[in-house]
Amino acid sequence: MYESKNSVYCYKGTNVLVNKMNIKDPIALKNYETSVIGLKLMALSKQGITGKFDVSHFVSIHKFLFEDIYPFAGLFRTENIAKDYFQFAEWEYIESELIRLLSELKSENFLANLTKEKFAERLSYYWAELNVLHPFREGNGRTTREFLRQLSLKNGYVLNLHKVSPQKLLNASIKSIIDTADLEKYLYACLEKWSHYFYL
């Protein structure tokens, strides 16, 4: 749960995000969110690559995933948030920093023609940077993972995160703020060439 006193995104006096179904029980909201997002991610997996790996692409993924749940879907947060005493990027700099980061990705030719080792290294870098940015009030991890899944697909890889336990990935993601080595190792293990995956 994010730390943000008197959040404009929550029902007054609670940590429950204002949602389109007006669900005020946090467990019920989490369960509803999980079921909806599962279907949305499945739909995206059938669509292939849905953008040009720019800001618009990243934002559109968040909007698609969360538009049936939260009114802020596809909108950058307008308050600062923290988790476990770590404060994510200040909201005023989100858009400019995301533009800078994805321009850097473009300058790297979207990681084309890299060895698997180098691809995993650069993928872990972008995962870590997007994590620090945390552009949205909720749904950052799922948006980032889908964005990087599509980036992997563009480069001929299937990014199968089910190969590593969610807890290991979470711990590596947290640690990636200062060291991406574990995240890089896990992402390498999760990457398979599309042709090999297809014929299994």
Predicted segment positions?
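FIC/Doc superfamily catalytic core
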Residues: 1-200
